Amino acid sequence: MAAEATAVAGSGAVGGCLAKDGLQQSKCPDTTPKRRRASSLSRDAERRAYQWCREYLGGAWRRVQPEELRVYPVSGGLSNLLFRCSLPDHLPSVGEEPREVLLRLYGAILQGVDSLVLESVMFAILAERSLGPQLYGVFPEGRLEQYIPSRPLKTQELREPVLSAAIATKMAQFHGMEMPFTKEPHWLFGTMERYLKQIQDLPPTGLPEMNLLEMYSLKDEMGNLRKLLESTPSPVVFCHNDIQEGNILLLSEPENADSLMLVDFEYSSYNYRGFDIGNHFCEWVYDYTHEEWPFYKARPTDYPTQEQQLHFIRHYLAEAKKGETLSQEEQRKLEEDLLVEVSRYALASHFFWGLWSILQASMSTIEFGYLDYAQSRFQFYFQQKGQLTSVHSSS
């Protein structure tokens, strides 16, 4: 989910109030003045950016004057702040140092120091395998990465058949990797349990949105979700866990026919396959590029249809099962089972990012309607859960 963002789950309109029992929006007083997202580097951060580039990149970066360093905000994350740092044109390169880099400054740290270390190791491994940007520097506040001429996909592009097929293939390749991390799938519920505990420990704020835990009985509901997923077979693979449009780059100068690159691996871990696919389908609904509060839109009707899901699943299986010969019956069974698996794990996506967003609201300095977003995700969770129950009851 970590991208840029606007409105709550509804018909696509921006703003409005949420009803507790559905995704419909009702008209409510415009008590929040319109404001646009601000994204700039403070004087102190500019000074530190200059120092980091000098120390970690060397070459011409050691000769650039502070006032010559070009620093531009990059549309990026709800977890991190991203900036493009460039050398001035008149300053020649000394060696092989890059002329521009991406500076990533960590936002509110929810994973802990150990997870940041693992992410840096993971980032370096993927770079060595040419599956991600190069890593130029790591420091407590963030890191310097290769700046890749590209643009992130747009939410509406996720539904384009050619791009959807390419994303499915890319995801299957990612799932096929062997990584030097624990293969036990503790990440999903381990992280959600930690988030829930942290939320319960938050001091009272008086904000009605912070009563989401009680409103939805989230502690009990997590137990219900766990039981459902324990009865849902899903292989454990190396998952990205956040394949949304902002984390999929369309390369401007691809070195081969593969024009897409996955980025932002901070949530990657061994996890259940169904979560990665279900999470991606949920992201068809959310557009994080809106420039006014609450900086996201939600269009529940954009959730992929069964036909669109099958299109994705067939291309995923074509890559994951490459070299295997399957009968038509075996292929059909795989597709049907995966549809059920993904629809159930999509619930976990809503639950995970809903908890994440409540926590972010309490600590993040990034402008985003985190509490609105949390409520949207939980409402969508209960709507989709109800649909699953209806299908099960009628079958």
UniProtKB/Swiss-Prot annotation:
A cellular-component GO term for this protein: cytoplasm
Organism per entry: Homo sapiens
EC number: 2.7.1.32, 2.7.1.82
Lineage: Eukaryota, Metazoa, Chordata, Craniata, Vertebrata
UniProt keyword Transferase, yes or no: yes
Gene that encodes the chain: CHKB
UniProt catalytic activity: choline + ATP = phosphocholine + ADP + H(+); ethanolamine + ATP = phosphoethanolamine + ADP + H(+)
Protein's name according to its UniProt entry: Choline/ethanolamine kinase
Function: Has a key role in phospholipid metabolism, and catalyzes the first step of phosphatidylethanolamine and phosphatidylcholine biosynthesis.
PANTHER family in UniProt: CHOLINE/ETHANOALAMINE KINASE (PTHR22603), CHOLINE_ETHANOLAMINE KINASE (PTHR22603:SF35)
